[in-house]
Every structure is written in structure tokens, then in C-alpha cells.
Amino acid sequence: MEDKIQSDDFTSHKNPTLPQVIEELKELWAMVLPITAMNCLVYVRAVVSVLFLGRLGSLELAGGALSIGFTNITGYSVMVGLASGLEPVCSQAYGSKNWDLLTLSLHRMVVILLMASLPISLLWINLGPIMLFMGQNPEITATAAEYCLYALPDLLTNTLLQPLRVYLRSQRVTKPMMWCTLAAVAFHVPLNYWLVMVKHWGVPGVAIASVVTNLIMVVLLVGYVWVSGMLQKRVSGDGDGGSTTMVAVVAQSSSVMELVGGLGPLMRVAVPSCLGICLEWWWYEIVIVMGGYLENPKLAVAATGILIQTTSLMYTVPMALAGCVSARVGNELGAGRPYKARLAANVALACAFVVGALNVAWTVILKERWAGLFTGYEPLKVLVASVMPIVGLCELGNCPQTTGCGILRGTGRPAVGAHVNLGSFYFVGTPVAVGLAFWLKIGFSGLWFGLLSAQAACVVSILYAVLARTDWEGEAVKAMRLTSLEMRKVGQDEESSLLLLDDEKLGDVL
């Protein structure tokens, strides 16, 4: 009977019905909406920091903006990228009910991020000499270096915050993350006001407020995991008859040799994930730099700043879709349901195209009004409005390609996304942007046509990799190898957790 049930699981949803599609839609958006809200709150926190920097003066705003850009490129993008390497491991471990691997992977990622924070901190400490070497204004550089120095503790908070987010999302725990983020961001505004306007700490006050806000998020998330008993429930078998005590598992999981011994395999997943995210993230910063070489650099850089803020806001939905579909795909593969994983991927891609189309619509219809929200300076307003439809078209490609990258991470293939981003953004987008903006003298819009070409190449490549090059049954076998065959014996026989796949596929793994 057990063989029959697991065989049915393996082939379930092979030909999905409409009710199954609707069920998947509900399950996906039950995760996506809280994560989108959380992303929007994080976006609001960043805007609040910039607003308080602006209250201090133009020098402080310029220095803070320079430092924020530098920390994003050298620090936060790396932290987020490495932490995303947890997605296939944790989601597939959760799907296969390998609670030990789930928790141990979280510990390993914290160690990896702690190691990564050391060279990053050296870069942040030496921001001043680096910027002066690159020819930046000394006054702006001094302000940026001051902000960066006081933001250093945020590296430590992110070594816990980023892995915790992936760890919880992989287990479909999304609403608590939203509420914890809301509580932390609610403190962000009064904290900035108190440090900047009352205590007159200036730029350091803005940096410290951001650090404290992230620290509050970490404390709340750790508190939730502890109070909810999630960790104890997971490692004790979650009511499935596991006889392992929490003490025994924690004792084994804390083994230094065991912890360090698994860093290599996790790094092999984390590094490509990091490259895939960073390559795209960094390209937007390159656009800002290229804007500084146009005929009217001040106008171009100002317009670029507004447009990147706009794309960051629009990115909150596809980023949530990517993270949640990664968890859904990983969960189903880990549970031995490859066709349900395929359904989750297809439903998420369909949603991504709808979101992209909505972005095209509003950027065309509301382009003048949106530009007017940021500036009353007519030349800047006209420039931003003229490029808004191009940005909308970019999102038509960005939404499905970001979601597709999430699917690839869920299947444990982040290297494919990294290769696609490298080729699309740097071997397609950059030459097109430079050629149109500088050689053909199209100017500012040429840079964004470069982004459009990059997104077009990226979405075609990602969709091909997901829709045409994914062997879902094979990915289920790989998920079994990743989770079941790596499970340590903790009070039960390893073989009891192996998925009962067909003999040929199981034989290939064993």
C-alpha cells in the first residue's frame, strides 16, 4: 500500500486539472502576498533613510547615497546572494521531512556569511581611500566613509537575518516575517527622528538607525522561531513517529566537524546563486556610472536615480514570486512530486507575465504623474516620463526571468541563472547600451534600451532552461540525493526516508 501511495504522489498532477491549478494559485499567493508586503516595508525603510539624509543637507545626501550604493554592491548583494543558496537545500529538505538537514544547513549558512563578512568589512573600512583613488570628491567621500563605518554592525545582523528569511520561507512561514518586518520598520521612523533631529548625530545617526532596525527584525524572527516551538517540532519528527529527542539532535548538529564538513557542498550552491543575483544587481549601478558620462550628467544621474527607485518598487512582486516559487518547487521535489513542482513553476510564470503586463500598463498611462511625484523640475520630469514606458517593457521581461531564476534555484540549478545573467547583461545589454547612448548619440534612453535588450535575452534564455530543459522526474531524483542520501542517522534508519521512485532512477542514484 505504501508503495502505491508514494507512486501516486510521484505521478500526481502530471495532467493538472483546473481545480488543481486554482489550488496551486491559492497556495502560491498565500505565500507571495506577505513576502511582497515585507519587501515593500524594506523599500519604505530605505526611502526613510534617504529622506533623513536629505534633511541633513545636500552634502550628507550625496555622501549617504554614495555609501549606500557602495554597501549594496560590495555587501548586501553578496549577503542576499549567498543566503539564496539555502533555497534548494532547505525547501527540498522540508519537502522530504529531513528536519536535521534543514536546521544544520541554516547553521552552515550563518558560518559562510560570517566568513564572507570579513573581506566585506575590510572594503567598507577602506571606502575613503578607494573612493579617493577613483577620483571622488573628498568631502562627499568623507561623509560616505563615516556612514559606512557606522553601518559595519549591519553585516553581523545580516548574517542572521538573510538565512532566517530563507529558512522560514522554505517552510512556507511568511506571515510572521511580514509582521516582524512591520514592527521593526515602525520603529525606524521615530528612531531616525530621535537620532538625527533630536540627538543631532547626523549621518552616523541614519546609519545606526538602519542597523538597529535590522537588529530588531533579527530578534523578532529568532523570538518567533523559539516561542512557536518550530525548531523543536521539526527536529522531533513533527508527529510522524520520529523518536529522536531535541537534545540528541542539537548535540549532533552542533558538532564542529559535521558543521564544517558540509560547508563545501553548500558553497557549491551558494556561490552560483550569489553570482546570479549580484550580476544583475551590479548592472543597475553601472547604468548610474554610465549616466555620468552623458552630455548632461547631473540630469541623467538624477533621472537614473528616480528610475532605479521605480524599478526597485516594481521588483518587490517578482522578487517575492521568485522566492516563493523556489520554495514551492523545492518542497514538491523533496516530497517526490515532480509534476506538482512543474505545475507550481508554470503557475508562477503565468502570474509573472500578468504582473509584467500590469507594469507596462501603468508606466505608460501614469508616466507624467509618476515623474511629478519625484520632481517639479520640468526638464527632469520630461526625461523621466519619456523613459518610463521603456522601464515598463523591461519589467515585462524582468518579472518572468526573475521568477524563472527562482525556479532554477528551487531545482538546485542556480549556475544556469548565473550564466544567463552574465551573458544577457554584460555581453548583450552593456554593448547595446554603450552603442546606443554614446556611439549613436541617442543619449539617456539608449542606456535603458540596453537594459531592455538584456532583459529580452535573459527571459528567452531562462524560459528555455525552465520549460524545455528541465527533467522534472530527474530533478526529483536529485532532490532525493540532496536530502535523503545526505541525512545522518539520528535515531532512525536512513533508508526509511528514501523516496520510492522507479527502480531505474533510484538505481542511478544509489
Curated annotation (Swiss-Prot):
It is found in: Peroxisome membrane. It is a multi-pass membrane protein. Keywords: Membrane, Peroxisome, Transmembrane, Transmembrane helix, Transport. GO terms for cellular component: Golgi apparatus; peroxisomal membrane; trans-Golgi network. GO terms for biological process: xenobiotic detoxification by transmembrane export across the plasma membrane. The chain crosses the membrane at residues 32-52, 61-81, 110-130, 143-163, 178-198, 206-226, 274-294, 305-325, 346-366, 373-393, 417-439, 446-468. Expressed in the vascular tissue of all organs. This is Protein DETOXIFICATION 54. It comes from Arabidopsis thaliana. The lineage of its organism: Eukaryota, Viridiplantae, Streptophyta, Embryophyta, Tracheophyta. The gene is DTX54.
